[in-house]
Amino acid sequence: MPENTAIASIFTAIVCFKFIILTLEAKEKSNLIRPEFKHPSPEQAAGILNRSFFWWFNPLLLTGSKQRLAVDDLFFNDDGLTFDAWRDIITRRWAKADISKPHALLKVMLATFKGLLLAGILPRLCLTGPETTTSNKVAYGLIAAYAIVYIGIAVMSTMSQHKNYRTIVAIRGSAVSLIYQHTLRLTSSSTSTSSSLTLINNDVERMGHGMREVHEIWASLIEIALSLWLLEVRLGVSVVAAVFVIIGNICTLLGCVFGFVKMGLLLGDRQKVWLEAIEKRTSSTIATLGSIRGIKSTGATDIVQRITTRLRLDEIRISLKYRELLVGIVTLSYVSTTMAPVFAFATYSIISNSRGTTPLLAASAYTSLTIFSLLGQAVSKWISSSVDIITTIACLERVRQYLATNLRVDPRTIESYIKPIDSSNSPRLRNSDISQTEMLDMGSVDQSQYHPNSVGEVLREVPLAKMMITIRDCSACWSKGSEMAISEINLTILKGSLAMVIGPIGSGKSTLLKVILGEMPHTTGTVIVGRSEAAFCGQSPWLTNVSVRNNIIGVSYLDANWYNTVVNACALDRDFEQLPDGDNTVIGSKGVLLSGGQKSRLALARALYARNDLVILDDVFSGLDAKTEQRVFESVLGSHGILRQGGTTTVLATNSVRNISLADHIVVMGSDGKITDQGTYQNLVFASSYLESLGTRQKTLNISDSEKSKDDTVSGLAVASAMHQPVDSDNRGDKDLTIYKYYIDTVGWVTWWVFVLLCSGFVFGLVFPQIWIQFWTEANARQANYRLAYYLSLYALWPLMAIVIFLGACAWLMIRMVSKAAIQFHGILLNSALSAPLVYFSTTDSGEVSNRFTQDLNLIDMELPTALIGTTVTFLSCIAQIGVIIYGSSYVAAAIPALIVFLYYIQLFYLRTSRQLRLLELEAKAPLLSHFMESIHGLVTIRAFGWTEKFTHQNHDLLERSQRPFYLLYCAQRWLNLTLELAVAFLAIILVSIALTTRESSGAKIGVALLSIVGFGLNLKTLVYTWTSLEIAMGAVSRIRHFAINTSSEDLPGEDRTLPPDWPHEGVIRFQSVSAAYSPTSHPVLNDLSFTVKAGTKVAICGRTGSGKSSTLAALLRLIDLRSGAITIDGIDISTVVRQDLRSKLITLPQEPFYYHASIRDNLDVRGQFSTEELLDILEVVGMREVIDKKGGLDAMANADVLSHGQSQLLCLARAILRPNKILILDEATSSVDKKTEEKMVDIIREKFQDRTVISVAHNLNTIMDYDEVIVLEAGRIIEQGKPLALALEPSFFASLLKAADGESEDALEEETISNIASPRSR
């Protein structure tokens, strides 16, 4: 006895000591952390009990239940989840990996995150083990044991999942960062917005979804082995039959899924094809959203809708093959779980009947069924987790393939001091000795010795420090085997000089600039530059969806004095005065409502603000009227311009030769991609046939200081102020029933109820056998194996029926419901987007709209179906099992209402926060996607400026911001999972207590109840898993619903008049006192316009930049609404006509060309009305047949990357010629082409549209001198109107504009403007 006392004392002391240690460990130590190391994450500072029971998460739930959450209200993620913690490790491992080998990324991820991944093994292992029995003589001990087991299961299950989700968050952040960093290093020709966005929205998200049950791969196998061992103990040899059923089904499954060769071969291949179809549709949609103004202007919304819908239908058709296989896999997973007990009990009963041994009784039956339930869950989890892992591996492989694509290698040589070209290497070059200053006067050069591709005539032993760019014998093409874009280029540009590159369209001007920037590899020769960085402005200005000021300063800091200098130099000061928020006004995605000139000047201002030593400009003045162009040119590139004063080297590719005499060096490109002439203006003005053909012998306009203070006014920019609202800002109060009803309305109520009935039949087939076993075992207790065939056959019938019904439910959902929902929701989105007013796209972030078409549709297509059937089946199963529990023990019924009330308030409390978190996750992800798209569109600009590292940091900040709601949503789900499992533990303890302390039910009924408790616990756990997935997917439905509701349509009530097929018959256009604005709250852009365009006449609208020219056409096309007045065409008020119908009856050639996502043939003739010969003839007319033949002919895909801007515009002109309508609208259609191409387009329009009404906005006034009438606008008003020649010969405002276009100064312009506004003239 003393020994026992001593042992007991030691044991007690050890327990107390452990308790003290546990208490100290559980005590939070945040108050002990030094201030410099304090972290805002409460989880990181929480103790072990706090983490185990998620107490640290309660404050956020309380806050979310009381108020509306914002991202800034959320906890920060702890250090272990940030990409900073893993950047060096994963970057180093990825650099060392053989990225060309399959699954290289998988290996890198496993090696990097093995610690996080392994952290979930121990708690998961605690859930796995054989059940042990406790003496039923100690009732209270058994009750305590049940409490410990069930609470332990709840805590360990939640902890295991939480550890796993931390791994998912870390991998998600790393994958997105790797994709972005790789994208910034790709060649400009290989970057695809759709590819990278598909990876982020689809593959990365599916990777996370597939990893949620990753530990079930190994844990389920252990549970299967343990369950089979326990069954063998209970049922003996009869368990072999069940084993054969399970093994047979697994083998069948493996045969279907793994293609008998490799795991995931069939499923992975089908998924890959499906994802490629998604990428194709996504690419078309993003291109559509980016060209929305041109699409609306040309009345092409119905064509775009038809093309995009066809891509969506193709995607759905392809996905059916994947879904069919998935239906088979899921059904097979249920075969083993439902049929295994049948075969086991049948074998046991048959052996018992033949040998006369103990029949199947309640104790062995319900114990075995409990084990079978656990076995079935283990088999199902192993199968589903295997499919998920296959999906994850396939997605990782797609990411690896993207990361393995060839990176851009800068082919240039960067040297601070550039050696001059050695004349011995080129017989064309001979040495001379002139300075930079002497280059400006080359009149004495002997033209007979001049060679077009020689720099020796203008450079003789130039000092090394004075050279900025040297190109030697360079030839370049966009891809291997393709035609040379430029050939045999020899060129040197000195520091501080201005070089202009001119030539016809397609001659390689832009290509030469790309070579200088290192964006295009050269096949031969060398390119040497004095700086790796350059301020670059592309032909299509790149703007981001931030304020005007932030677009100008980029990633630099604000220098107020320099900023104001740049703004004034680019003539933006007057624009700022018209903005409601000044230069803090957000301009919208791609500056959708800005005129071309305003976009160009913003981009130019950004280049100037950067203060780089090298500036490269690609036709930045093309969208400006002559007066504005001259003012900006003088301020920037004139003798006193800020680039000249700063000694900046500038290379300007241009189609405008108005100021070419100011260039220090001129490069003339030929149509064959070679330099045909180069030298100073004085050299070439007589020697260059091309330069002479352009008529460049002209004076340069000088702008007086008084004129510089007055310039253009703003047009549509003023609308992008306070209207900028996130598309999801108001939908956090959605009730779930409203969302579910909306989904059911979409798929159809009949379709829905068929699905519910099938699921109910399946649940009945699963649950009723538990009660049937009671009848069977009670009959056996009365008489051994009584009516064995009867009980056994019916027992087998229910599972067979359940399997057949489940197959029907899956097929009904996956093939019918999903396809219908996919078509309907895409149609809702597309209709809403295409019918939205143009102003919507300037006030809404492009990432938010793109998110609807990418992530939201993907959630509905991929996540929602499996979550829906899982939630429906498990919810019905829970209800059925509660009924069975009550049937087994009537006393438990008293606890059910309390449990229901508890669950109701828990879900109410939970949903208030989780609903906000799921929407915040999407809201926080939208800027990340927008930044991603903007980075891809501005890739060349970002790299040229040297902003790659800073944009990577911006991406990192946006990613970390989006990770916060993403991770906390997972935490909220784990909190709910823990709470519900504790509720199940409570119910189980009550049932066990009743069973051990009362005798109100039979053993069989108690067995039914205990079995149902186990099933209820398993199903409740599954319900949490599927319901949280369904909750996220239904969030996508909610966002689509709100997008459709809150996106107003441009079509207004009363706009329902139908037009005859051949309308307009004559083409008479009449403006009657028209005033218009881009939005009800913005400044009017048109004021009291009245004029008439007679049938068959040609009328030009001109004026300075921002005077209202494009807005006049926008009013005619119903892109903006009238505040007063009316516009009629052939006597019909266009405000009564459906807008799309109106636009489709007019021919519009916008400033920015766009393509449909289709072949060249379909782009020219989308309705299939013309033969191949007719299409080729039209291409011949516009001079594009040879170009198109080289690109692959009419059946090649239209691609803006392989055609120059001018070539694209000629293709759009060919499309316009094929249309028979009576009215042609030209919106600065020739502003971005060279003079020869412009003259060609003018001649084609004059010939092909001679009997039609033409209304044209033009900056080059020389192209409209033969028009019947010209209307001059200023500040949205008509100040002059008459015949161009008549106005040109008189002291008119038009004459002053014409003189400015011809390079002559007109000092009285401003006074005349004021005079004309006060009293407009008409001639």
From Swiss-Prot:
Predominant subcellular localization, coarse grouping? membrane
The record's annotation in SUPFAM superfamilies points to: ABC transporter transmembrane region, P-loop containing nucleoside triphosphate hydrolases
Record domain ABC transporter: where? 471-697, 1069-1300
UniProt membrane topology term:
Multi-pass membrane protein
Q: Membrane-crossing residues?
A: 6-26, 102-122, 138-158, 217-237, 240-260, 325-345, 359-379, 748-768, 795-815, 821-841, 859-879, 891-910, 976-996, 1006-1026
**An MF annotation (GO) of this entry:** ATP binding
Do you know which InterPro entries this protein is assigned to?
AAA+_ATPase (IPR003593), ABC1_TM_dom (IPR011527), ABC1_TM_sf (IPR036640), ABC_transporter-like_ATP-bd (IPR003439), ABC_transporter-like_CS (IPR017871), ABC_transporter_C-like (IPR050173), ABCC_6TM_D2 (IPR044726), P-loop_NTPase (IPR027417)
**Protein keywords:** ATP-binding, Cell membrane, Hydrolase, Membrane, Nucleotide-binding, Repeat, Transmembrane, Transmembrane helix, Transport
Q: Which residues take part in binding ATP? A: 503-510, 1103-1110
Which PANTHER family did the record assign? ABC TRANSPORTER ATNG (PTHR24223:SF399), ATP-BINDING CASSETTE SUB-FAMILY C (PTHR24223)
What is the role of the protein in this entry?
3-isopropylmalate dehydratase large subunit; part of the gene cluster that mediates the biosynthesis of pneumocandins, lipohexapeptides of the echinocandin family that prevent fungal cell wall formation by non-competitive inhibition of beta-1,3-glucan synthase. Possibly secretes antifungal pneumocandins, thus avoiding of intracellular accumulation and ameliorating the toxicity to the producing cells.
Name of protein: ABC transporter gloK
What is the species listed in this Swiss-Prot or TrEMBL entry?
Glarea lozoyensis (strain ATCC 20868 / MF5171)
- Gene responsible for this protein: gloK
